Amino acid sequence: MATLGVNIDHIANVRQARKTVEPDPVQFAFLAELGGADSITVHLREDRRHIQDRDLFLLKETIKTKLNLEMAATEEMLEIAKKILPDYVTLVPEKREEVTTEGGLDLKSNVQYLKKAVGNLQDSNIEVSAFIDPLGEQINYSKEIGFDFIELHTGKYAKLSGSDQYKELQRIIESTYLANDLGLVVNAGHGLNYNNVKKIASINNMNELNIGHSIVARALAIGLEKSVREMKSLITSN
């Protein structure tokens, strides 16, 4: 049965829109855990557009579940991760001009650098995941580089409908099975919401789904704890 990682970046987005102290994403992480979140996900971007360094340090000290740090594989971020020691790190591509992460890592073009970065984190007892598109080549490179996990990018699945969405779902399923055969743990995320999550959650051996925007959007109407509970129920009711 898949677990639920709640991404709280969008709480920090609201705070940073006014450069003030509220809403505090650390407080909302607590509410997400009350609602059933199995882990808390944050993306510390190089431009610090939402999550700040203080958020990371406080989350590490206060949350009761697990902390998943999304970050680019830069020297600065590697050093921060080794100071904070999150439960796991998810390496993601990052472009300053993007609104949100637009696609998976291109592992093929960065094999040697990523091997070094992954080994560096693992030497500090941090498990490492690669955020990748559901492609066999990327999964094989994930194994070669030495990642513990992969997170399959579900953004294309989320945007499609009908037979096109079904085809993308099959690609995600096949990617999950390939990764499992290689000994990789499989997570998934990006664009998942209350209408499309169940088919992804029902994939055999899907480990965790990382979801943020749809939960926070619904929380504006019904509150964060309840919105997390509803999503958790959809994931676990298969």
Curated annotation (Swiss-Prot):
GO MF, any single term: pyridoxine 5'-phosphate synthase activity
Site (Transition state stabilizer): 151
Residues the record lists as binding 3-amino-2-oxopropyl phosphate: 7, 18, 191, 212-213
InterPro entries for this protein: Aldolase_TIM, PyrdxlP_synth_PdxJ, Pyridoxine-5'_phos_synth
Signal peptide feature range: none
GO biological process: pyridoxine biosynthetic process
Intracellular or extracellular location(s): Cytoplasm
Catalytic activity from the UniProt record: 3-amino-2-oxopropyl phosphate + 1-deoxy-D-xylulose 5-phosphate = pyridoxine 5'-phosphate + phosphate + 2 H2O + H(+)
Membership in a protein family: Belongs to the PNP synthase family.
Protein name: Pyridoxine 5'-phosphate synthase
Gene: pdxJ
